[in-house]
């Protein structure tokens, strides 16, 4: 537990600076699931992300930020514990960190112990796959919502991924059906969890505005994690035939089998054919999945935009440090690989944006 992740160290340094200045800044930490730097601010010309692009004009943009491990639960442990997986031994699902480190102090707990109100909305710690939230970190109970969900009324049976994320079973429940990898219905933003998470964050900020205590508010969004269940209007922003398509769809030459991955998470969805790791998906399926990912990015950009705009409208932005962080990168068919769980650049490079109230212009760090 001796080695702090650089990101956690930055946040703790900000905390120490606030203490030294005798001014206690609030902290709004926004965590986004499976978000690689597919944003305009990071130079992605196809991505439609106007809210984050505009907001980042007065923020610090880290160009070379990486997750310590491209697995949801491990990456979040690394951030919230300030420790690497190589130090903790926490690499995968089903391992509650307090079973191994009962006296550990998490990042939000550090703030809580120093007089802050701490709260979590949405996906902060990974919940699912026999892994649970850490209630000790928060002043109030975690406000949890779904990661896997469908709005289609024809979807009535619980799917494998829904069961896993609901902590109903750890072994893959083969008796349950596979869900769709995407959904594009003409529905409101709040039909899906991220819209509801944004609204709860807005309500919570209204409550906190008159609070005498400073706050550490963690808000976690699920998209663009699979399934790409996103309102149709976000799909309509893109022409799938004009989105970036992987130019190399074969595994790196001489790469050992354990260094590459095609199946696993993505194979839990109905449209995905069973095949060997080296087999690329049909072009039409690849385009649909890439389309869904970009739609998910635009959807979550709007939800984050709602939260940031409300932070400003309440005046809380004048005394709040904002951190926006992706838990790891993502592969969209590049080198024949999908999702994450490998150590290639695309699976590990993340967006990291930090804004202090006194910042007047963007700073791009390549460190």
Question: What is the role of each PLM region?
Answer:
Residues 10-20:
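Hydrophobic h-region of N-terminal signal peptides that target proteins for export
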């Amino acid at each position: 537990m001796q080695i702090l992740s650089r990101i956690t160290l930055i946040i703790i340094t900000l905390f120490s600076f606030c203490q030294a200045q005798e001014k206690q800044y609030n902290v709004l930490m926004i965590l986004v699931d499976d978000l690689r730097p597919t944003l305009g601010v990071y130079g992605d010309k196809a991505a439609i992300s106007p809210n984050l692009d505009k907001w980042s004009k007065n923020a610090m943009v880290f160009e070379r930020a990486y997750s310590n491990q491209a697995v949801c639960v491990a990456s979040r442990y690394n951030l919230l514990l300030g420790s690497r997986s190589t130090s903790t031994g926490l690499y995968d699902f089903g391992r509650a960190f307090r079973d191994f480190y009962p006296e550990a102090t998490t990042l939000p707990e550090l703030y809580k112990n120093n007089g802050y109100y701490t709260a979590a909305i949405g996906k902060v710690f990974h919940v699912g796959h026999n892994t649970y939230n850490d209630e000790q970190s928060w002043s109030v109970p975690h406000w949890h919502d779904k990661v896997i969900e469908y709005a289609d009324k024809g979807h009535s049976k619980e799917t494998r991924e829904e069961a896993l994320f609901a902590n109903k079973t750890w072994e893959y429940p083969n008796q349950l059906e596979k869900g769709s990898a995407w959904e594009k219905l003409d529905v409101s933003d709040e039909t899906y969890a991220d819209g509801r998470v944004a609204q709860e964050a807005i309500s919570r900020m209204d409550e906190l505005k008159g609070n005498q205590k400073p706050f550490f508010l963690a808000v976690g969004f699920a998209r663009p994690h699979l399934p790409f269940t996103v309102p149709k209007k976000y799909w309509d922003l893109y022409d799938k035939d004009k989105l970036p398509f992987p130019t190399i769809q074969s595994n790196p030459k001489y790469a050992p089998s354990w260094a590459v991955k095609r199946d696993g998470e993505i194979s839990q969805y109905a449209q995905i054919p069973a095949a060997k790791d080296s087999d690329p998906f049909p072009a039409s399926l690849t385009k649909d999945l890439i389309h869904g990912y970009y739609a998910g990015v635009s959807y979550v950009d709007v939800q984050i935009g709602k939260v940031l705009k409300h932070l400003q409208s309440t005046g809380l932005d004048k005394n709040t440090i904002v951190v926006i962080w992706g838990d790891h990168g993502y592969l969209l068919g590049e080198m024949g690989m999908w999702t994450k769980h490998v150590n290639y650049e695309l699976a590990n490079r993340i967006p990291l944006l930090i804004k202090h109230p006194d910042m007047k212009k963007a700073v791009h760090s390549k460190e």
